[in-house]
Amino acid sequence: MAPGCISGFFGLAQYIAVKSKDLYKYPKEIPYTKSAFTEPVACVVNSVEKAGIAFGQDVLIIGGGVMGLLHVQLAKLRGARVIVSEPNEDRQELAQKLGANITFDPAEGDAIEFVKQQTEERGAEVVFNTTANPKVAQQALDFTAKGGTTFMFSSMHPNELVPTDMGAVHSQERTITGTVSPTITTFYRATQLIAKGLVDVETLLDKAFNYTDATEAFEHGARPETLKTMITFD
């Protein structure tokens, strides 16, 4: 797999030509449907490593999509108690299957108060926002404990300004930061996580289509309830 130093758009090409020094090799038994997750896993490795999660910390992940569920798994590997904010019941169940300790629907009741109840009124030490909704980004700050860090993993769509209580950021010593894309190092670590079976990526594959059914694949992938959709050349 080519690390982050390889850029460009290759469409649905079955093969691309790159220099051998720019590749990480997977064991032969790892199928393409797993190795194709390398880039998203590397992005999440970058995110979680920046957080410096400590054993026993409360980590709250907003969003139960593919990137949110990868955050669940890596935060668990770091020894955190994981809380997931996700309105879809099926994705809540999937988050629990992948290691989430607590899941809840943020649209039901007072979400901020719920998180406080689960964390002895503190809030979460680390909050990852994996959704693109600016209103949810604002809520992420309210979930964050005193001295905690809010990570904006997702870009905003639309890219609107997010109102921020800077007084609370000051008085509660909160940190707001972002993470984007993998590095060469996190790309390598992603290959190790997948090759050694330390992350479950197969569960995140909603459906794989042969390239001859590409139109159907795009239509399937455009549905909001789907997870990962792949096109294979088998």
Residue spans for each PLM region:
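Glycine/charged-rich beta-loop-alpha catalytic/anionic-binding loops adjacent to active sites
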Residues: 22-33, 57, 122, 172-173, ...
